[in-house]
From Swiss-Prot:
Belongs to the gamma-glutamyl phosphate reductase family. Pathway: Amino-acid biosynthesis; L-proline biosynthesis; L-glutamate 5-semialdehyde from L-glutamate: step 2/2. Its EC number is 1.2.1.41. One of its GO terms (molecular function) is glutamate-5-semialdehyde dehydrogenase activity. It comes from Rhodopirellula baltica (strain DSM 10527 / NCIMB 13988 / SH1). The keyword RNA-binding does not apply. This is Gamma-glutamyl phosphate reductase. GO terms for cellular component: cytoplasm. Catalyzes the NADPH-dependent reduction of L-glutamate 5-phosphate into L-glutamate 5-semialdehyde and phosphate. The product spontaneously undergoes cyclization to form 1-pyrroline-5-carboxylate. It comes from the Bacteria. GO terms for biological process: L-proline biosynthetic process.
Length: 434
């Protein structure tokens, strides 16, 4: 059966009356495929990644044509400018996807790594060995590049993946999966290892979330409402973050030029992503000197500044901020700004309004940086660096499957190791317990 017919058959089946049974079937097939992937030789996984990267480049025209269909439908789905930006694919972005797959291939395979090993007094030997989680159910919205990223990182870490993309990127994701399946057949990775759910019916998500016998973890990546629904309904563990209300705090000892550059990058380099800066805090003793320069730079980039009463003295074009503004993930050309009395006031503000994603301090005082990193309760805390660096690629982890603000199992960028668990291998010589 051709890749296209496989995809379309799955789509038709999932749109039949027996949706629940079809979801169970997909999950069971993924579970079976995961047993193969867990023992697959690293060379085969890397071959699939490298050949898939090359094949995606070769298929650029077809993928861009499919993406154009999604872009034409974007107004019907009410996508914002930020959403359309996340949806758009061109040759450069496809090349970036291919580069990401090659980078994953270059990373060490975590599966089989011995984390610990020791011998008991009676001669019994015990190993703690890294193993895949099994099956990942990955839910995402209008980012077709994530289709390849998620497939790549799951296969390299020995996991099967069920991909449920948003309707906004349906054509793009299908075109990418067709390429990955064709390569998989050549190298020995079954279609069931990487399955794209062929319906946008929201009921399908609910059916998959009940499949704890076959699905080992769910990772939702999208809007807060989606993630809260998944967290409430899932019967298996969930790796997630709700939003990205990221802060930059300018300390009293900050280099002003550095602060201006970091804030511009954190806010403006790419506004529609979860690690973009949404809130600026500045120490009262440096506000008069630093805030006008920062405001001038942000204004030149078209950013609307929503300011508290104290900040308004230095930002005459600012809009009065509401309490909701300080908790907002704007994903666009807006930023909230507040003047604070101290570093402690800044960390209190961040821990109250923030989302535990990424927060930064600009300072020349080592003690201040240590205090900030100790007090801010986020997955990544930056010192004199943009919030935009909280990213699997920037951390050298390869393409990430998401960023977690949870504290159990995974926190921060979720790379290969975050998609693994471990088991104990015990070797005896006829040992019995007395």
């Amino acid at each position: 059966m051709s890749t296209a017919s496989t995809t379309h058959t799955q789509t038709d089946a999932l749109q039949s009356d027996d949706l629940a049974a079809q979801c169970v079937d997909i999950a069971r097939r993924a579970k079976a495929a995961s047993r193969l992937l867990g023992t697959l030789d690293t060379n085969i996984k890397d071959q699939w990644l490298i050949e898939s990267a090359d094949a995606l480049i070769e298929a650029s025209d077809a993928i861009i044509a499919a993406n154009q269909l999604d872009l034409e439908n974007a107004p019907k789905y009410g996508l914002t400018d930020a959403g359309i930006d996340r949806l758009r694919l061109d040759e450069a972005r496809i090349a970036g996807i291919a580069t990401g797959l090659r980078e994953i291939a270059s990373l060490n395979d975590p599966i089989g790594e011995v984390l610990d090993g020791f011998a008991r007094p009676g001669g019994m030997r015990i190993e703690k060995r890294r193993v895949p989680l099994g099956v990942v159910f990955f839910i995402y919205e209008s980012r077709p590049n994530v289709t390849a990223d998620a497939a790549g990182i799951c296969v390299k870490s020995g996991n099967a993946v069920i991909l449920r993309g948003g309707k906004e990127a349906a054509h793009s994701s299908r075109a990418i999966i067709e390429v990955l399946h064709e390569v998989g057949r050549r190298v020995g990775i079954p279609d069931d290892a990487v399955q794209l759910v062929g319906t946008t019916d929201r009921a399908a998500v609910g059916h998959f979330l009940k499949q704890s016998d076959n699905i080992d973890v769910t990772i939702p990546r999208g809007g807060e409402n989606l993630i809260r629904r998944v967290a409430a309904e899932a019967t298996m563990p969930v790796i997630k973050h709700y939003d990205g209300n990221c802060h930059v705090y300018v300390d009293e000892s900050a280099d002003i030029e550095m602060a201006v550059d970091i804030i511009e990058n954190a806010k403006c380099q790419r506004m529609g992503v979860c690690n973009a800066c949404e809130s600026l805090l500045i120490h009262q003793s440096i506000a008069a000197d630093a805030l006008p320069a920062i405001a001038k730079r942000l204004a030149s980039r078209g950013v609307e500044m929503r300011v508290d009463e104290r900040a308004s003295a230095y930002v005459p074009d600012g809009v009065p901020a509401t309490d909701a503004d300080f908790a907002a993930e704007f994903l666009g050309p807006q930023i909230s700004i507040a003047v604070v009395d101290s570093l402690a006031a800044a960390t209190d503000h961040i821990n109250h309004y923030g989302s535990g994603h990424t927060d930064a301090i600009v300072t020349s005082n080592i003690a201040a940086s240590e205090q900030f990193t100790a007090l801010v309760d986020s997955s990544a805390v930056m010192v004199n660096a943009s919030t935009r660096f909280n990213d699997g690629g920037m951390f050298g982890l390869g393409a990430e499957i998401g960023i977690s603000t949870d504290k159990f199992h995974a926190r921060g960028p979720c790379g290969l190791r975050e998609l693994t668990s471990y088991k104990y291998i015990v070797r005896g010589n006829g040992h019995i317990r007395g």
